[in-house]
Curated annotation (Swiss-Prot):
Top-level taxon of the source organism: Eukaryota
TM stretches of this protein: none
Name of the protein this chain belongs to: Disease resistance protein At4g27190
Keywords, alphabetical: ATP-binding, Coiled coil, Leucine-rich repeat, Nucleotide-binding, Plant defense, Repeat
UniProt organism field: Arabidopsis thaliana (Mouse-ear cress)
A GO MF term: ADP binding
GO terms, biological process: defense response
Coiled-coil parts of chain: 24-88
PROSITE patterns from the UniProt entry: LRR (PS51450)
Entry comment, domain topic: The LRR repeats probably act as specificity determinant of pathogen recognition.
A Pfam family matched in the record: WH_DRP
LRR repeats: 502-523, 526-547, 551-572, 575-597, 598-620, 621-643
Family statement drawn from the similarity comment of this UniProt entry: Belongs to the disease resistance NB-LRR family.
């Protein structure tokens, strides 16, 4: 019996605890429900905030992103489960409450755990690097690749070692040197103030080393303005001074092909600036040794497992399936661990499920090994696989991109025009249709990793190795792709033995050619492309040289010093499709072009021609004429333009020639009515002499145009984002002008130095017709008759507010420059603008402007994203109404305020503009409050003087801590006063 006592006691204890727990849960049912509701509310809010902040993690490491995504997924599941249980408890009887209470407690524990993890994520999100010390360099990371991580660690060790002042990173092309140093750069950026360098400068050098270009990149990071006429020596001295001011700097020179004398660039020696370092990447160890590196790190190919993971990432999940995995792994191994090859082949095979296709690919890669004679060719074979997957048309398009110099950012429109001239684009109808097809091909080549984004908008370029591969294809081939590519090599002369009858394309662009051989016979009888642009020293093209290329379709002599073009009747270029003479500033005259029967494009932009090219009217296929920036063009004979029956594009932007209507033009000169006869015209940019054109509503041919730029009056160009169909009126009296018929087709209107603008505006308002297509309005240098203005305002506002016409219902941009308004409300009320679609306001040198919106106007501008105001001396605030319940710009992202000495406030005290991302305040010394709080999670950059920043007052003390990392101080300079000649008269 005694032995049973402990057992019975334990049983009774467990029964008591179980019973007590049930009773306690039943008693605490309501409190558990309340606790769960409160925790659930906090977790839901935390999850919402986390979603908004998710973008800020895009530049951080992958594991953190994955953890965040997993946390969000788990939080969503728990929130759904909790809400379901809370709904069930409503119908839960008293007898079931203990069980329900236990379930609620269990879910409550899960909610609290997720809440704790979420708070940790918020803490991580609040820690940001200092952006001005290290600029982010876009691209993939190698953090989780074993070999690359080891090499990165070696470089980091070198950065902390006193013995390693210069570090060389070397390896074969495409192995990942750039990716490695890019990762290093971005890791330093993430570390913010904890990393040891005051400034990190990332510079792309490239094969054809240009000291001036390298200096420009360094100077840009140092905020040093470069001037074209400044010598390299003088700029080097300024760079030296700038770098010596830095506490420590790290200079990363990427893609160095030849030894560089850093002294000539202005780089201080390491003994002069203790702790500073230089890293260079090169394909050749000899370059590193010549530059006296202290530590050389060889970049090897990826380990097999890392290579396989990279291959899977690019080829997709199909390679992990049982029927493909084994073969796919063999294909990955054939890439030899070379990242560029792995990415290219993986992308080419992405989503391919057919096993026979994979076997075919493996066979191709395996069989190519025996005839490879060099390491570089081993790189090309995997690239050739991707190339072979292209259609024939895409192959030719790809190879043509290799005609440009290394690291050259190619204008997409230029290369597509070449493709069109070569006949690669299908005849889809208009040039615009063909251009769209070409852009689609560009995107396809980018998807295959054979092209990548260029350094500027709407440009592309080739990776060095990919370009080398393309040249290898063209130089070794004897078929339609056989080409001679010597672009950007510093070539000073071209020998005849370099040319061959089998050549299809010849690129000698961007060299130092001073002369060309005068050949005596048709030699390059298959050549369709001859690129000679960028040879600034070339003054003459011998007729014999061009006669050697009888089948040319593309001839580019842009940027040369030629004064004349050989007689076309002697050249016999009967197949020529496109002739580019852009920026041949010495060219003043052309021969008759009537024998160029197949010519479709002529580019004379920036030439000094005096008269319209002769013979174009005889060309039945001619479609594109560029006469922009022809500053000396004086004559266009009558009845010539009207005969260009196939013309689709006439670009005379910033040309000296001014078109007139019939009856106003000089005798024998073309009139604007001739342009109306061009039934196929789609793109037009011209300058008109005066306003009669605007009075003639019969010019409805304009509505046929897809794009137009019409400048009426003096030459005046101001770019906006909506210039597809733009009308500019400059230096004219427009009191009698009626432009309503034209505004119906216009997307952008600019009025500059115009008199009688009140009468014109009054007519537009009285016509009671809105202009739905107009998205941009610019008013500049306008003095408004205040009495007339007030009269029009009162006339318009006398209507019921609901009846007021919105003259510009889709306006997105508004630019006011040197306009004597006191409030923006005057313009808004007079024109009946509701501003519901307005995104950008830019105001400068409006000396009388006191406020944007006055006390009578409680308008909000719901979609406004950017405000930029400068040199408005009288501006005191943005909104005169002292109390309004919500921000009048609830979606503002960018706020730029410059040189506003009397600006006192931009918002109510304590008001918050949650969407703000970028703030710039310079020389606004009386402004002491910003609409920013600690909840403004989108702030990316705040720019201003340090003294102003330190004077700011904060309604929310924690706001300063939150946004301090995003503040970029600017150099404090005296307030610039605009020249009197630029002020209102």
């Amino acid at each position: 019996m005694e032995c049973c006592a402990p057992v019975i006691g334990e049983i009774l204890r467990l029964m008591y605890e179980s019973t007590f727990s049930r009773v306690a849960n039943a008693i605490k049912f309501k409190s558990n429900v309340k606790a769960l509701n409160e925790s659930l509310e906090r977790l839901t809010e935390l999850k919402g905030n986390m979603s908004e902040d998710h973008e800020t993690l895009l530049t951080k490491d992958k594991p953190l992103r994955l953890k965040l995504m997993r946390w969000q997924r788990e939080a969503e599941e728990v929130i759904s489960k909790a809400r379901l249980k809370l709904e069930e408890r409503v119908s839960c009887g008293m007898s079931l409450r203990p069980r329900m209470s236990r379930k609620l407690v269990k879910i409550l524990d899960e909610v609290k755990m997720l809440e704790k993890d979420g708070i940790e994520f918020v803490d991580m999100l609040s820690v940001e690097s200092t952006p001005e010390r290290v600029e982010h360099v876009p691209g993939v990371s190698v953090v989780h690749q074993t070999m690359a991580s080891n090499m990165l660690a070696k470089i980091r060790d070198g950065l902390t070692s006193e013995k390693a002042q210069k570090i060389g990173v070397w390896g074969m092309g495409g192995v990942g040197k750039t990716t490695l140093v890019r990762t290093l750069n971005n890791k330093l950026r993430e570390e913010g103030a904890t990393q040891p360098f005051g400034l990190v400068i990332f510079v792309i050098v490239s094969k054809e080393f240009d000291p001036r270009e390298v200096q420009k990149q360094i100077a840009e990071r140092l905020d040093i303005d470069t001037q074209m006429e400044e010598s390299e020596e003088k700029l080097a001295r300024r760079i030296y001074v700038g770098l010596m001011k830095e506490r420590k700097f790290l200079l990363i020179l990427d893609d160095v092909w030849k030894p560089i004398d850093l002294d000539l660039l202005g780089i201080p020696r390491t003994e002069e600036n203790k702790g500073s370092k230089v890293i260079l990447t090169s394909r050749f160890l000899e370059v590193c040794r010549s530059m006296k590196t202290d530590l050389d790190v060889r970049v090897d190919c990826l380990l097999e497992e890392d290579a396989w993971e990279l291959f899977c990432k690019n080829a997709g999940d199909v390679v992990r399936s049982d029927h493909v995995r084994k073969i796919a792994k063999a294909v990955s191994q054939e890439c030899g661990g070379l990242p560029l090859a792995i990415i290219t082949v993986g992308t080419a095979m992405r989503g391919k499920k057919n096993v026979k296709l994979w076997n075919h690919v493996l066979s191709k890669l395996s069989k190519s090994v025996p005839w490879i004679k060099s390491i570089e060719e081993k790189i090309f074979q995997p690239l050739k696989l991707s190339y072979d997957f292209l259609e024939d048309k895409a192959k030719f398009c790809f190879l043509l991109c290799a005609l440009f110099p290394e690291d050259y950012s190619i204008e997409v429109t230029e290369v597509v025009r070449y493709w069109m001239a070569e006949g690669f684009m299908e005849e889809l109808g208009s040039q615009e249709d063909s251009m769209n097809e070409g852009i689609t091909t560009v995107e396809s080549l980018k998807d295959y990793c054979l092209l990548e984004d260029g350094d500027r908008r709407d440009t592309v370029k080739m990776h060095d190795v990919v370009r080398d591969f393309a040249i290898w294809i063209m130089s070794s081939s004897q078929d339609d792709s056989h080409s001679l590519v010597m672009s950007g090599t510093g070539l000073q002369d071209i020998r005849q033995d370099k040319l061959a009858p089998s050549l299809r394309r010849v690129s000698l662009m961007n060299n130092k050619l001073e002369s060309l051989p005068d050949l005596v016979e048709e030699f390059c009888v298959k050549t369709s492309v001859l690129l000679l642009q960028g040879n600034f020293l070339l003054k003459e093209v011998p007729i014999g040289f061009l006669q050697a290329f009888p089948t040319l379709r593309i001839l580019n002599l842009s940027g040369t010093r030629i004064k004349s073009f050989p007689s076309c009747s002697l050249l016999r270029l009967f197949s020529l499709h496109s002739l580019f003479l852009r920026d041949c500033f010495k060219l003043v005259k052309l021969p008759s072009l009537e024998t160029l029967a197949k010519l479709e494009l002529l580019d004379l932009c920036g030439t000094h021609i005096l008269e319209f090219p002769r013979g174009l009217e005889e060309l039945k296929r001619f479609r594109h004429l560029d006469l922009s920036r022809t500053l000396h063009l004086e004559s266009i004979p009558a009845r010539v333009v009207s005969r260009l029956s196939s013309l689709e594009t006439l670009d005379m932007t910033s040309s000296h020639y001014r078109w007139s209507v019939q009856g106003e033009t000089q005798k024998g000169q073309a009139t604007v009515e001739e342009i109306g006869c061009l039934q196929r015209l789609q793109v037009l940019s011209i300058r008109l002499h005066s306003s009669p054109f605007l009075l003639n509503k019969r010019n409805t041919w304009i509505k046929r145009l897809k794009k137009f730029q019409l400048v009426v009056g003096s030459r005046y160009i101001l770019r906006t984002r909506h210039d597809k169909r733009r009308l500019t009126i400059s230096h004219l009296n427009v009191s009698q002008v009626s432009i309503g018929w034209l505004l119906a087709y216009t997307t952008s209107l600019a009025l500059n130095h115009c008199q009688g603008i009140e009468a014109m505006m009054k007519k537009l308002v009285s016509d009671n017709k809105g202009f739905k297509n107009l998205k941009s309005l610019t008013i500049e240098n306008v003095i408004i008759n205040t009495n007339s203005w007030v009269e029009m305002v009162s006339t318009n506002t006398s209507k019921q507010s609901s009846d007021i016409l919105d003259l510009l219902p889709n306006l997105e941009e508004l630019h006011l420059r040197r306009v004597d308004l006191e409030t923006f409300s005057e313009l808004q009320t007079h024109l009946g603008l509701k501003l519901e679609t307005l995104k950008i306001i830019e105001i400068t040198m409006c000396r009388k402007l006191r406020t944007l919106l006055d006390k009578r106007n409680f308008l909000t501008i719901p979609n406004l994203e950017e405000i930029e105001i400068s040199y408005c001396d009288s501006l005191q605030n943005l909104h005169e109404a002292l109390l309004y319940h919500q921000p009048f710009v609830p979606n503002l992202r960018v706020l730029k305020l410059r040189n506003l000495p009397n600006l006192v406030s931009i918002c109510n005290w304590g008001e918050v503009w949650e969407c703000l991302e970028q703030v710039e305040v310079i020389h606004c010394n009386q402004l002491n409050c910003l609409p920013i709080s600690s909840t403004c999670g989108r702030i990316k950059k705040i720019k201003g003087e340090l003294s102003w920043w330190e004077r700011l007052e904060w309604d929310d003390p924690s706001a300063l801590t939150t946004v301090q990392p995003f503040f970029n101080p600017v150099r404090e300079v005296p307030l610039l006063i605009a020249d009197a000649t630029t002020q209102m008269l």
